[in-house]
């Protein structure tokens, strides 16, 4: 069974979002997603200050099995990227909710996310 954290919200495309309560958010891929993809070998991160429109791909995670896009859950601006993934993309496999986060962003509104109960149902 995949780990799901109850302090986050989730997207249909298996990303997690942590709301810091000040208009900033941290985002990564879920445990379910990293398990399906397998061992990570490369992460293509966006640039700081990039502005991304809702549902646009802005990041790519590559594993030994496949490459997968990461999509914006809202109109957002990148404020920080996890540079540790440049040297250790496998952090996503070992610690997808903590050390393996992808980006931090700011946004005026992040809607249409699933809470832990709803996300758990789509995994069943």
Curated annotation (Swiss-Prot):
Pfam families: GCV_H. The modification N6-lipoyllysine is found at residue 65. Signal peptide: none annotated. GO terms for cellular component: cytosol; glycine cleavage complex. Residues 24-106 form the Lipoyl-binding domain. SUPFAM superfamilies: Single hybrid motif. Keywords: Lipoyl. Its cofactor is (R)-lipoate. Binds 1 lipoyl cofactor covalently. Belongs to the GcvH family. PANTHER family: GLYCINE CLEAVAGE SYSTEM H PROTEIN (PTHR11715), GLYCINE CLEAVAGE SYSTEM H PROTEIN-RELATED (PTHR11715:SF3). This is Glycine cleavage system H protein. The gene is gcvH.
